[in-house]
A protein has these predicted regions:
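Short, cationic-aromatic polyanion-contact patches
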Residues: 3-10, 24, 56-79
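Pre-recognition alpha-helix immediately N-terminal to the DNA-recognition helix
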Residues: 12-15
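Amphipathic alpha-helical dimerization/coiled-coil segments
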Residues: 70-95
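Short, hydrophobic-biased segments on the C-terminal half of alpha helices
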Residues: 43-44
Length: 95
């Protein structure tokens, strides 16, 4: 059977960042089973698109998800990033 994911890698990285704004690229990669290079590229894509802002915090980066922005999908354009993230973050917080 073909392996697939409900969320794209970009969506999964966005959830990781929303859960922990100080998360390291190494930790994103390890938790999602991707390379650090892929994590770096995806975070760069999200930053270029304006969905994530990168801020230096000493030697590390902190990320700010722009939750007010609409989803890029046309079928869900009336929803914001924050509304969708709340669903995934609430599910993650449950024991």
């Amino acid at each position: 059977m073909t392996k697939w994911s409900f969320l794209t890698k970009h969506g999964r990285v966005l959830v990781c960042i929303a859960h922990d704004p100080g998360v390291r690229l190494r930790d994103i990669a390890a938790s999602l089973g991707i390379t650090e290079r892929s994590a770096y590229t995806i975070v760069g894509d999200l930053a270029t698109a304006g969905y994530v802002l990168k801020q230096r915090d000493g030697r590390r980066n902190r990320y700010v998800v722009q939750r007010h922005l609409p989803l890029p999908e046309t079928a869900l354009h009336e929803r914001t990033i924050g509304e969708v993230l709340e669903v995934f973050l609430a599910a993650h917080a449950r024991p």
